């Protein structure tokens, strides 16, 4: 690599779902690497959730970041006039099990993004769920299968990155580690029952590092499972959170052959990652309890 050349090699990216778990960490990763980011998501400035308000406050008035509501046609026009080195689509939470937004709406936005990528000849990176390759039928699998199908209909260079359970600061409140930590901070018992995919676990910032490095990598086209390369990591996390009794069953590692497995290089130690999530949740306890 030439001196001064960036690994990611990008100057401007578009992130659809800039306030989701992966999307928000990806925004921060890009800014840290000096990459300009245009972000779209559902929230409008005057009707934001408290958590998303806080997320945008933390980015602050950064010259590298521009946010538009996905419903804002003027915002879309600005986006469609720009040139991007890579586009990321992460409008759905890959670990969510139910209560999804209207899928027609999501597929409509995906279509619009595919058109943009076709016109500008830019690679589209889709964040999907590892459950798509599972034999079990779930709402998560059904939904992400549809999104992946929608992507294949276009004439666009794409990578689909299927992720397992993710953890770290800003983990969504419907997730098990979040619920356990919140219960511990409030000195209450956790009655939350896990429906999470327990086959593997990744720290969200490690995933974003990989996505930044490979955003425009055209050797990486197709469908990939991003994995830790370690055994029973989710279960180990449950043990560290003293919740062994809430581990229902080991998810069998059965995946379809459509995706290639990639063990990501950067692998944050589990204890360190959990401590980061704990420190974050201590700091924002009132926000999460509200």
Stretches with model-predicted labels:
Residues 210, 214-257, 261, 285-289:
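Mid/C-terminal beta-alpha module of Rossmann-like enzyme folds, strongest
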Residues 141-200, 204-208:
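NAD(P)-dependent short-chain dehydrogenase/reductase
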Residues 11, 257-290:
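Amphipathic terminal alpha-helices
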Residues 2, 6-82:
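N-terminal Rossmann/SDR dinucleotide-binding element
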Residues 169-172, 195-210, 223-243, 267-272, ...:
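Substrate-binding strand-loop-helix patch
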Residues 50, 97-102, 135-138, 172:
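Conserved catalytic-core motifs of eukaryotic protein kinase domains, centered on the activation segment
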Residues 86-94, 105-141:
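Conserved Rossmann-fold NAD(P)-dependent oxidoreductase catalytic core, especially the SDR/UDP-sugar
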Residues 17, 91-92, 125-130, 162-164, ...:
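Active-site beta-alpha turn of Rossmann-fold NAD(P)-dependent dehydrogenases/reductases
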